[in-house]
């Protein structure tokens, strides 16, 4: 399952550590295992996107998306690279979800996927 945070420009680390990842950051800023986590049922992929969000970056200024369609294209290319590195996961069911503005990128990603 691919998780896309809202924003735009919201780091998916928020979803990972605050909402539904296997661990959460508690009030004393230590990490605690979450008893109910999506990762107990699904293999999770948390992506900081577009480039420049969270820990995502590029050394080339031309690598930054200038519109939502470029963001979807970059995500498509990132996932293609992911599956090149981990082909054993290709047979797994694949879900894409997100919240707030991340939901827009979910729709754009599938539109791109449909036409590719």
Regions found by a protein language model. Give the residues of each.
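Short helix immediately C-terminal to the catalytic nucleophile in hydrolase catalytic domains
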Residues: 102, 106-110
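N-terminal cap/lid subdomain of alpha/beta-hydrolase-fold enzymes
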Residues: 1-73, 80, 84, 109-115
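Short, intrinsically disordered, charge-balanced linker/junction segments flanking boundaries
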Residues: 97, 104, 115-116
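Alpha/beta-hydrolase fold nucleophile elbow
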Residues: 87-101
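Catalytic nucleophile-elbow at a beta strand-turn-alpha helix junction centered on a G-D-S/GDSL motif
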Residues: 48, 100-103
